[in-house]
Amino acid sequence: MHIDNIENLSDREFDYIVVGGGSAGAAVAARLSEDPAVSVALVEAGPDDRGVPEVLQLDRWMELLESGYDWDYPIEPQENGNSFMRHARAKVMGGCSSHNSCIAFWAPREDLDEWEAKYGATGWNAEAAWPLYKRLETNEDAGPDAPHHGDSGPVHLMNVPPKDPTGVALLDACEQAGIPRAKFNTGTTVVNGANFFQINRRADGTRSSSSVSYIHPIVEQENFTLLTGLRARQLVFDADRRCTGVDIVDSAFGHTHRLTARNEVVLSTGAIDTPKLLMLSGIGPAAHLAEHGIEVLVDSPGVGEHLQDHPEGVVQFEAKQPMVAESTQWWEIGIFTPTEDGLDRPDLMMHYGSVPFDMNTLRHGYPTTENGFSLTPNVTHARSRGTVRLRSRDFRDKPMVDPRYFTDPEGHDMRVMVAGIRKAREIAAQPAMAEWTGRELSPGVEAQTDEELQDYIRKTHNTVYHPVGTVRMGAVEDEMSPLDPELRVKGVTGLRVADASVMPEHVTVNPNITVMMIGERCADLIRSARAGETTTADAELSAALA
């Protein structure tokens, strides 16, 4: 059932409580509720997405930025980046899967294998994770030629039809620039290739968000309770450091209510809000908690550390001909290419948008247009690391988000971005784009040297809105990994995390489908633990009766 007024909830005790109805949280809650013997509550601060066309209709996604469905987090002043930038975080059921452009990728094998081999995240290699991608999807490409794809999962993946003539010309131009057409999500990592994306969208234009895919079908299920408009204030622990529930605040009157979990709580509020809630609950760097007068439950120095993102630049062009008036989601093509030899994954990705993108350029005086296109190079494995910190002990205050863009000592991130600007220009200048590429609006042909391009990037870069890694999983003995490989918060019991914050290293691609996969994996881990406890209890009972 769905409850948007906590006063109408009489029974406030559940077997499992999932805090955050986003990309992973919805998957966790739905999978746990498949067992009719357990009760599951899913708590979301934002509203229900059902009946909200600007959320459900994928081609309207850009309307949601800086809207009432966006937490809209400013970032701290950047020493080497764009301090005006804001991090869009969705405030609605489905989380960022209800707020994004639904670009759908399986993470490359190399990324997942590295999680295990380099960071000690046992059980997260590609061999273990890829069956979860298959389980969650109904993929248009599934069939005898692609047996790795799923055909019965809740999340619908489709191929963007090549209807945009500028996009088709752009892919021809990529080939002329040495970047061939390549199919995505085949199981082979595309190091150098371009094509129209796969997206998680249904045939009628509805986004296949985690809410649409996992929650809409089960809202009326007897053992499932959806609670919206309720913001988590603090996690609750008993004297043995077991997480027994969560204190939530209703948006109407600001009253605090307590929900109790008999078994486990799963925290799934994203790479910015998950470390915030842990720290408000006494789990985090001890010195930082003490600064804010918060009693330390667990000194966990890795909470809020290791913030990673995909920083993004933009090259904008006027179009010589009218651009498309309709699109699946306006950013339909991806381009991958390496900037140096010998890489097993591309260090540069670009998105092609059939729209202008002047969010960060107009304020600096760069010209704009209403008929143009954009190429947005981004750094797939940025080496800069940032932090998320508390602004105060007040749960209502936005956290301090400091991505520290372009601060890696080797200068890798800026080097790749400059190379990306140059590659975007090279592609747009190919003969195949002669009928489309007009004046370069930004950075403009005047910017040619590395120093000029670096100055442009620092002023105008954006984010692909992919923050990860702030509560990473890792080896049990690694004190900078707040989670063990089973997503359990170290130092307490009864608490797991499932969202983008758990990634020990960023993935090369758009991460949203991987975040859903993390939700699937978390549910499996919980069910396995429950099955083990049941088996042990049965054995103990049998021994007692013998």
From Swiss-Prot:
Keywords: FAD, Flavoprotein, Nucleotide-binding, Oxidoreductase, Stress response. Signal peptide: none annotated. Its EC number is 1.1.3.17. The active site is at residue 466. Its cofactor is FAD. GO terms for biological process: glycine betaine biosynthetic process from choline. GO terms for molecular function: choline:oxygen 1-oxidoreductase activity; flavin adenine dinucleotide binding. The modification Tele-8alpha-FAD histidine is found at residue 99. InterPro entries: FAD/NAD-bd_sf, GMC_OxRdtase, GMC_OxRdtase_N, GMC_OxRtase_C. FAD binds at residues 23-24, 44, 71, 90-92, 96-103, 232, 465, 500, 510-512. The keyword Cell division does not apply. Pathway: Amine and polyamine biosynthesis; betaine biosynthesis via choline pathway; betaine from choline: step 1/1. Changing residue 464 to A: Results in a 2-fold decrease in the limiting rate constant for flavin reduction. Has no effect on substrate binding. Changing residue 312 to D: Reduces catalytic efficiency 230-fold. It comes from the Bacteria. Gene3D superfamilies: 3.30.410.40, FAD/NAD(P)-binding domain. Changing residue 312 to A: Abolishes enzymatic activity. It catalyses: choline + 2 O2 + H2O = glycine betaine + 2 H2O2 + H(+). Homodimer. Catalyzes the two-step oxidative conversion of choline to glycine-betaine with betaine aldehyde as an intermediate. Glycine-betaine accumulates to high levels in the cytoplasm of cells to prevent dehydration and plasmolysis in adverse hyperosmotic environments. Accepts either choline or the reaction intermediate betaine-aldehyde as substrate. Belongs to the GMC oxidoreductase family. This is Choline oxidase.
